């Protein structure tokens, strides 16, 4: 039984998240463009570790749902994301809450029958103009930006940053990593700096 069905059918309201990614060639250039577009730095470069969980048989993956425990600096968050809609932008409903003890939450999830299915790591900066958010991610498979806000705002912001619609990426990091593995024939099983470096040698 998928226990998340019970979770979803509670009275909690799910917020909607609309976003796109694009690849970044030069981090300094994109930061300069963000400054020029009126963005301010919300969060300095911070280490982030993400663990996705699933039930036996990959129940969530088959339904294109996601359960993630994230450590961002010293903070922890637990997030559930629905299947969502993929068009020019990616839109998914989500539930998210802060967690005071990430290791305890990991133990709770395992006790409920979930197990880690994928880990991915990055360094992230967060920028905002009070209408939406742009994050700059340094990952083991390259650098990316993520623009999150209303669809119209996303397109306007992308234009300011010199990003065309053809450059939009709506795939998540797990999918991007799987594609990268096929292209590079890497043996890495998770998207962490140490494992990717070892698996790519």
Regions found by a protein language model. Give the residues of each.
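N-terminal amphipathic/basic-hydrophobic helices that include classical n-h-c signal peptides
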Residues: 1-13
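Intrinsic disorder/low-complexity signature
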Residues: 3-6, 47, 164
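N-terminal strand-loop-strand beta-hairpin
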Residues: 11-132, 167-201
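A contiguous pocket-lining binding segment that forms or flanks enzyme active sites
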Residues: 136-141
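A hydrophobic, small-residue-rich beta->alpha segment in the mid-to-C-terminal subdomain
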Residues: 152, 158-164
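Short loop/beta submotifs within extracellular cysteine-rich repeat domains
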Residues: 41-42, 154-156
């Amino acid at each position: 039984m998928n226990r998340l069905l019970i979770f979803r059918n509670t009275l909690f309201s799910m917020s909607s998240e609309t976003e796109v990614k694009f690849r970044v060639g030069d981090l300094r250039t994109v930061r300069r463009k963000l400054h020029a577009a009126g963005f301010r730095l919300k969060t300095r470069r911070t280490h982030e570790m993400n663990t996705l969980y699933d039930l036996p048989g990959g129940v969530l993956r088959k339904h294109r749902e996601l359960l993630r425990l994230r450590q961002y600096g010293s903070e922890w968050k637990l997030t559930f994301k629905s299947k969502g809609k993929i068009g020019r932008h990616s839109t998914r409903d989500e539930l998210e809450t802060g967690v005071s003890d990430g290791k305890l939450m990991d133990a709770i999830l395992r006790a409920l029958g979930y197990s880690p299915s994928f880990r991915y790591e990055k360094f992230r900066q967060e920028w905002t103009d009070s209408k939406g958010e742009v994050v700059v991610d340094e990952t083991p498979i390259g650098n990316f930006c993520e623009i999150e806000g209303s669809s119209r705002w996303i397109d306007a912001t992308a234009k300011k940053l010199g990003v065309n619609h053809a450059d939009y990426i709506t795939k998540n990091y797990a999918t991007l990593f799987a594609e990268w593995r096929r292209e590079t024939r890497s043996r890495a099983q998770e998207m962490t700096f140490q494992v990717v470096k070892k698996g790519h040698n």
